[in-house]
Amino acid sequence: MAAPAQTLTTLLTFDGSNGSDPYVMALVQGTDGNFYGTTSNVQFTNGGTVFKTTAAGTLTTLYNFCPQTPCVDGTQPYAAPILGIDGNFYGTTHEGGVMNHGTVFKMTPGGALTTLYSFCLKANCADGYHPHGVLVQATDGNFYGTTKHGGANAWGTVFKITPSGTLTTIYSFNVSDGANPTDGLIQASDGNLYGTTGGGGNLSCSAPNGCGTVFKITTGGQLTTLHNFSGVDGATPVAGVVQASDGNLYGTTQLGGTQNMGAIFKITTSGTLTPMHNFNSGASQPLAGLIQATDGNFYGTTSRGGNPLVCAPAGCGTVFMMTPGGTVTTLHTFDLSDGSNPDGGLLQGTDGTFYGTTRNGGSGGANDGTLFSLSVGLGPFVSLQRYLGKVNQPDGVLGQGFTGTSGVFFNGTPANYTVVSDTYLTTKVPAGAETGSLTVITPGGTLTSNRPFRVTPQVLSFSPPSGAVGTVVTITGVSLTQALGVGFGDYVPAKFTVNSDTQVTATVPKGAKTGPVGIETPGGIGISTTKFTVMP
């Protein structure tokens, strides 16, 4: 397909004094409409920074790490902080802290930083160390992330941390199920967390510690390996995955594929993997994951590719687009003067434009990286702080032109809202809401969310509490209108009728076993807290 018309603009060149080496997952949009990110280094302290920048490239340094040694506040933040539902930013540093093995921090929009946790406080670093990727705030309000090293088996961990700083290691990798997770996690529509490990898994592949994995883990710490990479289907997935509008997960591998230069894959939440694209010398070694933009296509970056004479030996890197069918088009090739090695991936701002960073390159010979924007002609939209939740759950909406807003709707159901500023409003999931787009009616027109909000169903009770095959059971809950299936015990499909948003009747099917009652909707699966007893 023909590439869309695009315009790349270098907004800022880092020069050391304002930071250098912006690295993984470099930018996030704040409630003020500005973009926030980190640099892993800065002149004088080499501790790195947290910064904010306008869409035009006016940069403000909010925090300098390691103002004096030892660096108990952290050093080398590799990933951007995320915007918490409380309006603060939460992130990690790769090094520093009490034990110099990394930290989790909270920062106000004004730049006041609090260290929430220092890693390697437990014997043999059983709590993990060297967090490398971005955090995710789940629907339970806690933050989840990974450490590249440490844990009970020394191969990295998955952790949970409360907003106040209480950390729990919920899983330690052991090589056979994965090793050295580099990026963070996502919470998918089923409520589970998904991620990748850069090593482990298939130990017979060419990589010394395995070619890496894709995994699923519950918030309680039950891990399932979905796929072990073999090399030909990809190797070393250093970036995480994204859940697309079709419900599948998409991601990249740095190496492997038919050319051993990286690959793009699609994988279902049950673990069926489909190779989508194999990179070659024209664009290779993606270190960042993908985003699905408002046009339905996927956008990403490769760390290498382009003219090897400018950036020896493999080029300065590229920005690319992939259709849902797997057709890849290179949109921009970096030439060093406008940046090199876009390792951090892209963010689509609510103005429709893409924003990103390069780790190196830039004008003036500083080679400390750049901040850039890329327009492909997409229009404005709204984004949500959470895209999954139950009725009455609070949420934040980012966008522009909110002053004078006259309505907020969850897939057509009106919701209460408060306009906080021209770029931010708060709302709650209304009763009767169904999975679908969120829309905001502003004086300038209707803005639609870039992704559907998935309303989680709830099963509150059922009657009778027991019965034989053929018994009709009345199930009471919330958000049941879009029910796709009902199951008893081991979730053998049952015939059912949706009576209302709060009631479903189902017939106990042949083969049902004693256990919880579950209802699946496009928003996920609701499971009862009590068991239905199947009588003989």
PLM regions: where:
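Extracellular beta-propeller repeat domains
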Residues: 1-469, 486-488, 500-512, 517-536
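Conserved beta-strand segments that form the floor/walls of ligand-binding pockets within enzyme
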Residues: 474
